[in-house]
UniProtKB/Swiss-Prot annotation:
This is ATP-dependent Clp protease ATP-binding subunit ClpX. ATP-dependent specificity component of the Clp protease. It directs the protease to specific substrates. Can perform chaperone functions in the absence of ClpP. PANTHER family: ATP-DEPENDENT CLP PROTEASE ATP-BINDING SUBUNIT CLPX-LIKE, MITOCHONDRIAL, ATP-DEPENDENT CLP PROTEASE ATP-BINDING SUBUNIT CLPX-LIKE, MITOCHONDRIAL-RELATED. GO terms for molecular function: ATP binding; ATP hydrolysis activity; ATP-dependent protein folding chaperone; protein dimerization activity; unfolded protein binding; zinc ion binding. ATP binds at P120, T121, G122, S123, G124, K125, T126, L127. The gene is clpX. The keyword Cytoplasm does not apply. Residues 2-56 form the ClpX-type ZB domain. Keywords: ATP-binding, Chaperone, Metal-binding, Nucleotide-binding, Zinc. CDD domains: RecA-like_ClpX. The lineage of its organism: Bacteria, Pseudomonadati, Pseudomonadota, Gammaproteobacteria, Enterobacterales. Belongs to the ClpX chaperone family. Gene3D superfamilies: 1.10.8.60, ClpX chaperone, C4-type zinc finger domain, P-loop containing nucleotide triphosphate hydrolases. Zn(2+) binds at C15, C18, C37, C40.
Length: 424
């Protein structure tokens, strides 16, 4: 097509769509025996844009994974915690279904379901949240509740959480409003006593109060591109009612609170029922019976608990589960180190007894899955230090004695020469 004012005969030209002459428009574009003006081009673009907006939600609805699909994906990366996965899958599915139907269905407003994860250190709380965000392809950010303070005090303002989320998606507000925020160590902002204090608790109850509106849903004013706030500045307006908040914490001591409530057999004197150690419920079993009243007694304020209606509890990982974590997930720790050694052209083998020894060590340390990496890293440190300087190494073997610190990894050379790594 070409831009024309007159045809070769000097005849006045008109737009074939709106009928305006070439003198009434800025541009007239010629096609085979037809003309279109710049105004009609703009109008066509507007029509197409509107239609794309209408079609997009229908495409998104069909692409929303079901709870079963979400659960299956979590199974690929997270070992155990079956009940927590099910709770998360349903809550996340309902949240994004609400967003894609405009927050209401047949005039009924759909409430927001934020999530509270309760479980010991290293049980998979953070990994579950990260895996969900990656699977759903939505922006994800983490915040540490212990660094947060009320606005006006030294520390991190709660609205900085939204700023971090915006940074993850290049300050695209629409993308950020579909994101997931994980707030860790939420148990550390419990108030210091059951009774409301007349003094300010800026890092405990004060932070809970500051988080209330953010989690429930408010329009957060965030400075563009991470600048500081000042009165003359234009702010980005972010609707937090569309953001899914997942709060997690170990809640050490919460099991004792639940035990006090559920222990109906307590008594004094000769008729008292005394439970043996075998009859006592485990921490994981007790946490699965958590109720809002227990969390209030622990130190969370009722209004804050009300904003986290979906509660999922995670159990402490067993030795068998830790061995599975080392071996089975798509990004299992042993697979990561094997890939690292493959970059050097070396095969890395973990014997079964080595995996058992790693799991036992993590159980003793009570660090859960989080402590596995440090154990493996310590066992492989000397080998990873020496390996780039060694030639003809085909294979490195890790057995139980290496994990126990009694020997160095076994190096197998190309000419079938075998020796212990340096240090022996």
């Amino acid at each position: 097509m070409t831009d024309k004012r007159k045809d070769g005969s000097g005849k006045l030209l008109y737009c074939s769509f709106c009928g305006k002459s070439q003198h009434e428009v800025r541009k007239l574009i010629a096609g085979p025996s037809v003309y279109i003006c710049d105004e009609c081009v703009d109008l066509c673009n507007d029509i197409i844009r509107e239609e794309i907006k209408e079609v997009a939600p229908h495409r998104e609805r069909s692409a929303l994974p079901t709870p079963h699909e979400i659960r299956r994906h979590l199974d690929d990366y997270v070992i155990g915690q079956e009940q927590a996965k099910k709770v998360l899958a349903v809550a996340v599915y309902n949240h994004y279904k609400r967003l894609r139907n405009g927050d209401s269905s047949n005039g009924i407003e759909l409430g927001k379901s934020n999530i509270l994860l309760i479980g010991p250190t290293g049980s998979g709380k953070t990994l579950l949240a990260e895996t969900l965000a990656r699977f759903l392809d939505v922006p994800f950010t983490m915040a540490d509740a212990t660094t947060l303070t009320e606005a006006g005090y030294v520390g991190e303002d709660v609205e900085n959480i939204i700023q971090k989320l915006l940074q993850k998606c290049d300050y695209d507000v629409q993308k950020a409003q579909r994101g997931i925020v994980y707030i860790d160590e939420i148990d550390k902002i419990s108030r210091k006593s059951d009774n409301p204090s007349i003094t300010r608790d800026v890092s405990g109850e004060g932070v809970q109060q500051a988080l209330l509106k953010l989690i429930e849903g408010t329009i957060a004013a965030v400075p563009p591109q991470g600048g500081r706030k000042h009165p003359q500045q234009e702010f980005l307006q972010v609707d937090t009612s569309k953001i899914l908040f997942i709060c997690g914490g170990a809640f050490a001591g919460l099991d004792k609170v639940i035990e006090q409530r559920t222990d109906t057999g307590r008594g004094i004197g000769f008729n008292a029922t005394v439970k043996g150690s075998a009859e006592k419920a485990t921490e994981g079993e007790l946490l699965s019976h958590v109720e809002p009243g227990d969390l209030i007694k622990f130190g969370l304020i009722p209004e804050f608990i009300g904003r986290l209606p979906v509660v999922a509890t995670l159990r402490e990982l067993s030795e068998d589960a830790l061995i599975q974590i080392l071996r089975e997930p798509k990004n299992a720790l042993t697979k990561q180190y094997q890939a690292l050694f493959n970059l050097e052209g070396v095969e890395l083998e973990f014997r079964d007894e080595a995996l058992t020894a790693i799991a036992k060590k993590a159980m003793v340390r009570k660090t859960g899955a989080r402590g596995l990496r440090s154990i493996v890293e310590a066992a492989l440190l000397e080998t990873m230090y020496d390996l780039p300087s060694l030639e003809s190494v085909d294979k490195v073997v890790i057995d139980e004695s290496v994990i126990a610190g009694h020997s160095e990894p076994l190096l197998i050379y190309g000419k079938h020469e075998t020796q212990q790594a340096s240090g022996e």
